[in-house]
């Protein structure tokens, strides 16, 4: 070989190692995806499972790598038909295998060049060169093992080549070599052991240089603890001193990587195990630490079995085989417990480190090495556990189940967050370090070199100049630093000075190598913090252990003490994209989608768990609030009364019931109630949810708090509806006051959540409670507004119209009447003023408006029926309207009227509905006056000062505003809207107006018939009649006002007409002699007074002109006298 070939600068070892290592990872990624695709029936190339091609595939695999297209037409006939599709669809697979072959060629060339150059390797001196060399060896080995694991490789390559031959008349030019490689590497390690015989010297030198690094890293937890490893506070006096080491990059070098180097390296150059005691010690130590190694992602390599299978066929290796068996037994017995103790130590060490650095972030400067060591150590232990979890021995299964793994991952994430947050602090420190110390020391070292060739001198001078030119101002100005060129120059310099016969030999100037390694670490602290975090703490491997990942998460949530660390799992999803490679861009979407789905699932589960805890607390609080309801004090009052009256009972008295609040009396602080446990668990979980405001996963931003907010909204909605306890079958529903108590208790708990998590609980209340004021919520589910509206209309008011319930004006409530069939509910408990106020609180103005509109819809249907009755009697009523002063004619006409009772019944039903509405409106007014007194008083003032000459449309707008605030109006806007929607297309407005007028006539002339009804007796105690005819007053006034507003008539004139007709009709009762007909005459007379009292349009003077006041006075006297007699 010529001298020029041996010149290191022309060999470009540094560049080749860098490029080939990166390309090797890319090739591994592509092969891994091919293996996974072939293992998945859904993703497998269809030609491998096509029944028509089955015989062809078997033939190709059997003959592989030979190509026999002749005399096999029958077997390959189907292949001939699909050759173009096969070429198209299998090209990516085929050329990936070709790329692997080319990669192998390049690696072999480089390994040969390194051997020829007799490169010196020492991980503590030329770190980058040695690491990249060992990485390349392991990557190459892993690639060939992974290739041998693709069972369909022969079928894919063979199918493609046959299709190529059929299409182009010749095999693919790469096929012969590729086919031979596939055959040669059937047993890849055996083949590579032969292949690496020439490289044994270089490889063993590199591996043996680990003797100072690997044993120091592979210590037990007790040794770490005794050395107070990673502790910043063990020696307070040296806390500000920079963490230094002669082997800076080796301190955070992955233990996992070193074990792969040692295991695979000494398998390839196994001869050294027999000649070098150091090699044997390293090999045995690595074998005792693990049962399997991670080849790539979730592909593992069972080291003991593989090594034994390889050595068993080598003569004189019985001793090595015994070593392997002993190490296997040691790994099975002790490795699990050793790694468990390490994780236990690292949890406390990382916690201490994270706590100190969060308090004093300035220590990230001098102690940066500790941070990256801690991250690397923890990452190694987590990966070890992950790959062994599926391959654990049954004897010591507990050592491979770590329920506290979340805590370790959490502290890793905390340290990562500190590094990202305080990056500028570290930059300032290391910029000063590089310019003020490293540049000076390096300059002295260079000056003291006995020999320094020109090329090397130029490179090292550029190092000194680059560092000297640095200043803190660059950091303050936000300048972007880039030392990649400097680091590549040092890599090149390592290659130049590590070959044999180099003028400046790095082996003779170890101090220079160690100093430069330290400087390189310092430069990384300035410009490559993110890359350093990926190098030392990347856990993207979890992406390929989805089942184990989810299981760890579930264990974390199940253990209350660990739930505070559950945020670590969603945070890990941010790592996933770092495992992608540019040589395999097609997997980015797959991995990205997996990261999104897992992150979403974790955050959703955390929010659900928190929601469930909150729900349990709310349930407990609702129970406690329920105990304070007035109904529960009845028993206490009863006991007190009995005690006062000294009633002696034969039996012993019942044990005294515990009073509400007794649960708060603590006699012992060790006693932990269920509520305490729930609050503790909630605070732990909320810490996790509140840990980060948001996280970015594959160009998506996740906000953990929003998950909790949305879950709370959904659960609060369901809980409110659930607490109504509405049963459609039995028509049972919770009293509004009890529901309000429960809702307030629920809201109090939800408000306390703001103490744990920074969420806007007011927004939750607004969203949920506003939706509950509508007919349906955003999911189309019924709300408390629709449930209570239906119940009051279909249950309470229906029973009123059936005569089982009466409206008592004196009590402002509906009350059950004594009947044969007792009702399942007490009407008073749902309709008194306190219940109606509670209903108004719950439904709010919107909900009460919906209730009103529903009531008006029922009234409008009754009015429609009344109009039909008027139309049936239109001729008679027209005559009666003009003949009220002709008694005989009126009597004759009255007899011709039909459906008189139906008219009165329907008007009474309308009156009952309007009475209920007035209760609801009054309650709403009271509630709003309490919450918004100034606004209500302004609306009231506005309503009371509408000028009489105001346009009716304007007035109706004011009335609508007033009605929404619960204020009574002369004309009910809701009723006007309901009745105006009834206008018939076939009837002219004049005809509609006439029907409205005749309706009032019909009601007026029908009133006397009420006197004959037994139930029409007026009761002074309730200020009404038991058959609810006192509600007619409200019905007549409101219906008249609404109808004549719609038809633009004079309300006052029509009511005067009604009063004249009604008083004339009632006066005739006085002349009747039949006692049955007149039994409740006085009670019916009072209706006139009620109508006038209720009306804003009629006066007592007007009534006096139609109906003698003396009759009213006598009627009141008579009914009160009758009431006293009945009571007696």
UniProtKB/Swiss-Prot annotation:
Superkingdom assignment: Eukaryota
CC per GO annotation: filamentous actin; lamellipodium; lamellipodium membrane; postsynapse; ruffle; SCAR complex
Tissue-specificity statement: High expression in cerebral cortex, not in cerebellar cortex.
Instruction: Please list the GO biological process terms of this entry.
Output: apical protein localization; basal protein localization; cell migration involved in gastrulation; embryonic body morphogenesis; embryonic foregut morphogenesis; embryonic heart tube development; endoderm development; establishment or maintenance of actin cytoskeleton polarity
List, alphabetically, the InterPro entries matched.
Answer: Nck-associated_protein-1 (IPR019137)
Region span, Disordered: 640-665
Task: State its location(s).
Answer: Cell membrane; Cell projection, Lamellipodium membrane; Cytoplasm
- Looking at the UniProt entry, the stretches that span the membrane are 995-1015
Q: What is its quaternary makeup?
A: Associates preferentially with the first SH3 domain of NCK. Component of the WAVE1 complex composed of ABI2, CYFIP1 or CYFIP2, BRK1, NCKAP1 and WASF1/WAVE1. Within the complex, a heterodimer containing NCKAP1 and CYFIP1 interacts with a heterotrimer formed by WAVE1, ABI2 and BRK1. Component of the WAVE2 complex composed of ABI1, CYFIP1/SRA1, NCKAP1/NAP1 and WASF2/WAVE2. CYFIP2 binds to activated RAC1 which causes the complex to dissociate, releasing activated WASF1. The complex can also be activated by NCK1. Interacts with NYAP1, NYAP2 and MYO16. Interacts with TMEM132D.
Q: Write out the function statement from the record.
A: Part of the WAVE complex that regulates lamellipodia formation. The WAVE complex regulates actin filament reorganization via its interaction with the Arp2/3 complex. Actin remodeling activity is regulated by RAC1. As component of the WAVE1 complex, required for BDNF-NTRK2 endocytic trafficking and signaling from early endosomes.
What family does this chain come from, according to its entry?
Answer: Belongs to the HEM-1/HEM-2 family.
Q: Which protein is depicted?
A: Nck-associated protein 1
Q: Which source organism does the UniProt entry give?
A: Mus musculus
As recorded in Swiss-Prot or TrEMBL, the protein's gene is named Nckap1
């Amino acid at each position: 070989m010529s001298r020029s070939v041996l010149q290191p600068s022309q060999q470009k070892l540094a560049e080749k190692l860098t490029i080939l290592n990166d390309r090797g990872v890319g090739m591994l990624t592509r092969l891994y995806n091919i293996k996974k695709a072939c293992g998945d029936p859904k993703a497998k190339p269809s030609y491998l499972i096509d029944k028509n091609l089955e015989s062809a595939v078997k033939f190709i695999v059997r003959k592989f790598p030979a190509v026999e297209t002749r005399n096999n037409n029958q077997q390959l006939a189907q292949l001939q038909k699909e050759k173009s599709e096969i070429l198209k669809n299998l090209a990516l697979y085929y050329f990936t295998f070709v790329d692997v072959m080319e990669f192998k060629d390049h690696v072999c060339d480089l390994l040969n060049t390194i051997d020829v150059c007799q490169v010196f390797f020492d991980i503590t001196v030329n770190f980058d060169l040695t690491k990249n060399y060992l990485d390349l060896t392991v990557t190459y080995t892993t690639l060939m093992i992974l290739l041998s694991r693709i069972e369909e490789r022969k079928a894919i390559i063979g199918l493609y080549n046959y299709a190529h031959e059929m299409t182009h008349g010749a095999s693919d030019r790469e096929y012969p070599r590729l086919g031979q490689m596939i055959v040669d590497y059937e047993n890849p390690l055996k083949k590579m052991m032969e292949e690496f015989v020439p490289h044994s010297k270089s490889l063993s030198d590199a591996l043996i240089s680990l003797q100072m690094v690997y044993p120091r890293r592979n210590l037990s937890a007790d040794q770490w603890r005794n050395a107070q490893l990673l502790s910043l506070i063990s020696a307070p006096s040296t806390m500000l001193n920079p963490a230094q080491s002669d082997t800076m990059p080796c301190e955070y070098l992955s233990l996992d990587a070193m074990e792969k180097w040692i295991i695979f390296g000494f398998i390839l150059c196994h001869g050294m195990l027999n000649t070098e005691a150091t090699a044997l010690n390293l090999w045995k130590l690595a074998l005792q630490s693990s049962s399997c190694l991670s080849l790539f992602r979730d592909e593992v390599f069972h080291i003991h079995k593989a090594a034994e299978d390889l050595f068993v066929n080598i003569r004189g290796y019985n001793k090595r085989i015994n070593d392997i068996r002993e190490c296997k037994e040691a790994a099975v017995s002790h490795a699990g417990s050793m790694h468990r103790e390490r994780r236990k130590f690292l949890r406390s060490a990382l916690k201490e480190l994270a706590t100190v650095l969060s308090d004093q972030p300035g220590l990230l400067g001098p102690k940066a090495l500790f941070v990256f060591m801690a991250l690397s150590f923890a990452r190694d232990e987590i990966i070890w556990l992950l790959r062994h979890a599926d391959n654990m021995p049954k004897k010591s299964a507990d050592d491979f189940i770590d329920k506290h793994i979340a805590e370790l991952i959490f502290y890793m994430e905390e340290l990562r967050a500190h590094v990202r947050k305080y990056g500028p602090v570290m930059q300032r420190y290391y910029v000063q370090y590089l310019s003020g110390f490293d540049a000076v020391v390096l300059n002295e070292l260079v000056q003291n070199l006995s020999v320094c060739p020109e090329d090397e001198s130029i490179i090292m001078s550029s190092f000194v100049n680059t560092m000297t030119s640095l200043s803190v101002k660059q950091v303050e100005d936000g300048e972007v630093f880039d030392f990649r060129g400097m680091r590549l120059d040092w890599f090149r310099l390592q290659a130049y000075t590590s070959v044999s016969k180099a003028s400046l030999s790095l082996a003779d100037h170890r101090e220079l190598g160690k100093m430069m390694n330290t400087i390189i670490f310092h430069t990384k602290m300035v410009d490559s913090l993110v890359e350093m975090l990926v190098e030392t703490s990347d856990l993207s491997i979890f992406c390929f252990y989805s089942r184990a990942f989810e299981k760890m998460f579930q264990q974390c949530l199940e253990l209350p003490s660990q739930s505070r660390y559950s945020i670590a799992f969603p945070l890990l999803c941010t790592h996933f994209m770092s495992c992608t490679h540019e040589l395999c861009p097609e997997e980015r979407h797959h991995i990205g989608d997996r990261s999104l789905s897992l992150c979403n699932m974790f955050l959703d589960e955390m929010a659900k768990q928190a929601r469930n805890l909150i729900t349990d607390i709310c349930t407990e609080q609702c129970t406690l609030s329920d105990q304070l309801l007035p109904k529960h004090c009845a028993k206490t009052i009863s006991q007190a009364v009995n005690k006062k009256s000294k009633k002696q009972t034969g039996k012993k008295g019942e044990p005294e019931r515990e009073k509400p609040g007794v649960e708060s009396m603590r006699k012992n602080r060790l006693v932990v109630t269920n509520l305490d446990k729930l609050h503790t668990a909630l605070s732990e979980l909320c810490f996790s949810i509140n840990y980060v405001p948001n996280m970015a996963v594959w160009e998506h931003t996740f906000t953990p708090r929003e998950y909790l907010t949305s879950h709370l909204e959904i659960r609060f909605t369901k809980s409110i509806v659930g607490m109504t306890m509405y049963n459609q079958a039995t028509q049972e529903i919770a009293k509004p006051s009890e529901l309000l108590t429960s809702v307030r208790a629920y809201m109090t708990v939800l408000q306390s959540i703001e103490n744990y998590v920074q969420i806007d609980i007011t927004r939750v209340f607004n969203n949920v409670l506003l939706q509950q004021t509508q007919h349906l919520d955003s999911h189309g589910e019924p709300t408390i507004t629709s449930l209570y509206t239906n119940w009051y209309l279909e249950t309470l008011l229906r029973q009123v119209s059936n005569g089982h319930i009466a409206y008592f004006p004196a009590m402002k409530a509906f009350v059950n009447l004594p009947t044969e069939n007792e009702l399942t509910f007490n009407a008073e408990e749902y309709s008194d003023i306190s219940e109606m106020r509670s209903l108004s609180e719950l439904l709010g103005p919107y909900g009460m408006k919906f209730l009103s509109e529903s009531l008006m819809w029922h009234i409008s249907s009754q009015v429609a029926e009344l109009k039909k009755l008027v139309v049936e009697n239109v001729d008679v009523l027209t005559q009666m309207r003009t003949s009220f002063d002709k008694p005989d004619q009126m009597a004759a006409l009255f007899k011709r009227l039909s459906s008189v009772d139906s008219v009165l019944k329907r008007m009474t039903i309308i009156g009952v509905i309007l009475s209920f509405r007035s209760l609801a409106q009054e309650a709403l007014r009271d509630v709003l006056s309490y919450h918004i007194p100034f606004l209500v008083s302004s609306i009231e003032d506005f309503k009371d000062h509408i000028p009489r000459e105001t346009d009716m449309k304007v007035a109706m707008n004011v009335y609508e505003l007033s009605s929404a605030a619960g204020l009574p109006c002369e004309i009910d806007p809701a009723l006007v809207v309901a009745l105006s929607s009834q206008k018939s297309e076939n009837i002219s407005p004049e005809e509609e107006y006439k029907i409205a007028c005749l309706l009032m006539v019909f009601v007026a002339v029908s009133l006397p018939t009420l006197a004959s009804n037994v139930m029409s007796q007026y009761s002074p105690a309730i200020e009404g009649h038991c058959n609810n005819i006192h509600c007619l007053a409200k019905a007549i006034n409101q219906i008249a006002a609404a109808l004549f507003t719609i038809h633009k008539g004079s309300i006052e004139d029509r009511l005067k007409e009604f009063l004249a007709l009604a008083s004339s009709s009632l006066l005739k009762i006085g002349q009747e002699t039949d006692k049955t007909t007149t039994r409740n005459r006085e009670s019916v007379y009072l209706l006139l007074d009620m109508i006038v009292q209720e009306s804003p349009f009629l006066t007592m003077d007007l009534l006096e002109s139609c109906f003698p006041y003396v009759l009213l006075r006598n009627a009141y006297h008579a009914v009160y006298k009758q009431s006293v007699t009945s009571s007696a």
